[in-house]
Design a protein with these regions (language model features):
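Catalytic binding pocket for nucleotide-activated donors in carbohydrate/polymer assembly enzymes
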Residues: 5, 17, 24, 32-35, ...
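Glycine-rich, highly charged phosphate/nucleotide-binding loops
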Residues: 50-76
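Short beta-alpha junction loops
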Residues: 9, 35-39, 89-90, 121-126, ...
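A short beta-strand-loop structural module common to alpha/beta enzyme folds
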Residues: 29-44
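Extreme N-terminal starter segment of soluble prokaryotic enzymes
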Residues: 1-3
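Conserved alpha-helical elements of sugar-nucleotide-dependent glycosyltransferases
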Residues: 11-22, 100, 104, 213
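Catalytic core of nucleotide-activated saccharide and alditol-phosphate transferases
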Residues: 80-186
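A short, glycine/small-residue-rich beta-strand->loop->alpha-helix junction that serves as a flexible
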Residues: 6-16, 92-94
Length: 283
C-alpha cells in the first residue's frame, strides 16, 4: 500500500507522530510531503523537543520519500497513492510553530474518493476543526479528544513496540518520582533513567492535562508499572477508547491509599500483555 502522508513536521504532534511511526514500523510504503526530521534516528537535537524527545522521537531508521510539489500533484492526479492521510488538520494558539497542514487538499478531494482520505486531529480541544469546516465531506475524521460520534471516529496514541521493557524488574517503591505538573519532580534527563524509575515503582502518577490522552500513560505501562490515574472516573466515553480504564479504576482504589493491590502481579502481567497487543503504534 502506498500512502501519502501530508504533514509539515514543523513541531511534534503526538497523535500524528504515533500514526506516522506506526505506518513506518509496519512497513507501509509511505511518501511524505515534508521531511520528518525529528522522527529519524539521525536527528541530533532531541533535547530540544517537547518531553525531552523521549519515547517516540528519533527512533526510525527510515529513508523518507519526499517528492517535489509538482511530482506529488502528478501522483495525486494519477491516483498513484492508495490512501492519503492528513496528519494535523487543527489550528492552535500562539507559542507553537504552525503544524496544521492541508497541502494539496484541492487536488486530493478532486481525485480521491472519501474512503481513501483520512484527517487526523490530535488537538487538546474538544472543538472539531475538521468537522466544523466540512472536511467530513471529503474523508474520515479521526480525533483523540472526541465528544460526538457523529463528528468523527475516536483514535488514541500508541507507543513504539521497541520501547516495551524487555525484563521483569523488581519493585523498590510504591510511587514513581515524577508527578505531572510538578517541575521539581522532572529530574530525569535521559530516557533510560526516566523509564527505570517507572519500572522499579508499583504505580506511576498520571492524569488529564491538555487532553485525556497522553504518552505518559503508555510509558508507565510499557515499563511494567501500573498508572495511578486519579481523575479517570471523569474521562468521557469517546476519549482513551482503547485504554484499559476499568482495570485502572480498580487499582486506583489501592494506589490512592498507598497500598499495593493484592493481585498486583497478575494485573500487571495482564496490562503488559494488553499494551503489547493493543496499544503500540502498530495497532
Amino acid at each position: 500500500m502506498r500512502v501519502l502522508y501530508v504533514f509539515n513536521f514543523e513541531y511534534p504532534e503526538y497523535l500524528s507522530d504515533t500514526i506516522y511511526h506506526g505506518l513506518i514500523d509496519l512497513g507501509v510504503d509511505v511518501y511524505e510531503t515534508h521531511y520528518p526530521s525529528y522522527m529519524l534516528k539521525s536527528f541530533d537535537r532531541l533535547d530540544q523537543i517537547y518531553g525531552r524527545g523521549f519515547t517516540i522521537f528519533g527512533k526510525l531508521n527510515h529513508t523518507p520519500k519526499v517528492d517535489t510539489e509538482e511530482e506529488i500533484i502528478d501522483k495525486i492526479k494519477s491516483r498513484f497513492y492508495d490512501m492519503v492521510i492528513y496528519g494535523c488538520v487543527y489550528t492552535h494558539g500562539e507559542g507553537f510553530p504552525k503544524r496544521q497542514c492541508l497541502d494539496y487538499l484541492d487536488e486530493v478531494i478532486k481525485y480521491y474518493p472519501k474512503d481513501q482520505v483520512h484527517f487526523i486531529d490530535g488537538s487538546d480541544s474538544s472543538w472539531n476543526f475538521a468537522h466544523s469546516f466540512g472536511l467530513n465531506s471529503y474523508g474520515s475524521i479521526w480525533k483523540s479528544h472526541l465528544v460526538d460520534y457523529g463528528a468523527g471516529k475516536p483514535l488514541s496514541f500508541g507507543i513504539p513496540e521497541s520501547q516495551l521493557i524487555k525484563n521483569r524488574p523488581s519493585k523498590e517503591k510504591i510511587f514513581a518520582t515524577i508527578v505531572p505538573g510538578k517541575q521539581d519532580t522532572y529530574i530525569y534527563h535521559n530516557e533510560e533513567e526516566y523509564y527505570k524509575d517507572y519500572s522499579v515503582s508499583y504505580y506511576g502518577t498520571t492524569f488529564k492535562k491538555g487532553q485525556w490522552d497522553c504518552m505518559r500513560h503508555y510509558e508507565i505501562l510499557a515499563n511494567r508499572c501500573i498508572p495511578y490515574f486519579p481523575d479517570l472516573e471523569e474521562c468521557p466515553a469517546l476519549s482513551l477508547v482503547d485504554f484499559p480504564k476499568e482495570i485502572i479504576k480498580e487499582t486506583n482504589k489501592y494506589a490512592r491509599r498507598n497500598e499495593i493491590h493484592p493481585f498486583y502481579d497478575e494485573i500487571n502481567d495482564y496490562l503488559f500483555d494488553y499494551i503489547k497487543n493493543k496499544l503500540t503504534t502498530k495497532k
